[in-house]
Amino acid sequence: MSIEVVDVRKHEHHFGVYVVKFEDGTERLATKNLTPGKRVYGERLIKWRDEEYREWNPYRSKLAAAIVNGIKFIPIQEGTHMLYLGAASGTTPSHISDIVGERGLIYSVEFSPRVFREFIEKLVDQGRRNVVPILGDARFPYQYAHYVKGVDVVYIDVAQPAQAKILADNADYFLKPGGYVMLVIKAMSIDVTAPATETFKQEINTLKERGFEILETVHLEPYDTAHAMVIAKKK
């Protein structure tokens, strides 16, 4: 038997993010479904007052984990244009798609052809017209420069060394003046021998050296071990 929803409220800090309260007292994040009736990764669909919401699982999405862990500022609004590096099969991009709405746009770069096909099946083929799938390697932004116009945000979530460098290189190509970057640091993908905190510092210093002001850093435990989310702005 499903647990009844007793309330849905707007998140106090983040546009387009909602908090769903259930009758047992538990609360879950959600976004308003841009394509009602359709799921992306098996998430629960929640009906409330003639609207449909998609539960946003912090164990499946590092952005959701950052929100649950108290990040105060995320530079994503209705109409935001974003370059998303490491789109994978589309879990987090799908929720960003809900948030930015029909006026927004998410250029979604994925390296693996198999995963790329899955992304298209789950998002584009299901009617998410604000998502532009790009099969490419985030290390080489010139390869897809003819597809991407200036963006408000560059987001990266890749299992590569030099994650901050890859992000900054893409920002040099595509980020509008005064734009923001969102860096998911995967410490074990950079150096399995160093403490995660040292790897975080190293990547943050790379962003600073490339002209970014660090606005906020949040660790993602217990949802993702040795991961952190960094929000920064181009000076």
UniProtKB/Swiss-Prot annotation:
The keyword Cell division does not apply. Pfam families: Fibrillarin. Its EC number is 2.1.1.-. One of its GO terms (biological process) is box C/D sno(s)RNA 3'-end processing. It is an enzyme of class 2 (transferase). S-adenosyl-L-methionine binds at residues 91-92, 110-111, 137-138, 157-160. GO terms for molecular function: histone H2AQ104 methyltransferase activity; RNA binding; rRNA methyltransferase activity. Keywords: Methyltransferase, RNA-binding, rRNA processing, Transferase, tRNA processing. Belongs to the methyltransferase superfamily. Fibrillarin family. Interacts with nop5. Component of box C/D small ribonucleoprotein (sRNP) particles that contain rpl7ae, FlpA and nop5, plus a guide RNA. HAMAP family: RNA_methyltransf_FlpA (MF_00351). Involved in pre-rRNA and tRNA processing. Utilizes the methyl donor S-adenosyl-L-methionine to catalyze the site-specific 2'-hydroxyl methylation of ribose moieties in rRNA and tRNA. Site specificity is provided by a guide RNA that base pairs with the substrate. Methylation occurs at a characteristic distance from the sequence involved in base pairing with the guide RNA. PANTHER family: FIBRILLARIN, RRNA 2-O-METHYLTRANSFERASE FIBRILLARIN. This is Fibrillarin-like rRNA/tRNA 2'-O-methyltransferase. It comes from Pyrobaculum islandicum (strain DSM 4184 / JCM 9189 / GEO3). The gene is flpA.
